[in-house]
Amino acid sequence: MSAGYLDDKGIVPNSGFQRYSARLKADYQVKPWLKMGGNVSFTHYDSREQDTEGGTSNANIFYASNIMGAIYPMYVRDAQGNIMVDNRGFLRYDYGKPGQDSNGSRNTIPNANPLASYMLDKMKYSGDVVSGKWSADIDIWNGIKAKVNIGVDVNNVRATEMVNPFYGQYSETSGVGGLIGVSSERTFSVNQQYLLTYNKTFNDVHNVDI
């Protein structure tokens, strides 16, 4: 029997992966002619990330830092250069689009701010994975043997997404007012294998293996 725990902090804000796992494995010689075995594992995980943080998405902070010049500000600042705060207590991020919070405009990914997406938007996956493998080895008679393998895998995943209604392309001023989404997925699979073999040596010379 074994158990494990992983808490992997992400390198970007509000991201990370947490996992709990356990495994039980046993073999038992039931009779001289029958051996049985089992291997069962359970995993629960929680993942925090941005739904559109990959590839050339505006929420990909690494992509944005490569294509957007360092002259563009991350935050909206006042005349003294201080980062401004809105009436909700949020830092005001620069979206680089007139009519939105910005110190100016930019052609590169306008109406978006990857850091703001990480701080204000939420995406979480929670999953439970159960995997079981069972086997039986049967010595039937005089070189004839049977083997049975059965495997069951169950995977339950629940995803929750929240895109803030305050800033960005889904803000109230854009006519959307934020997004909320919840989805669930369950997969179940069974794998069965039944084998019958024959192995016999005659006169210490000839061998038959089927």
Language model features with spans:
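Transmembrane beta-barrel architecture of outer membranes
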Residues: F17-R23
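Surface-exposed loop/interface segments of Gram-negative outer-membrane beta-barrel transport/assembly proteins
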Residues: I11-V12, K25-S131, K147-I210
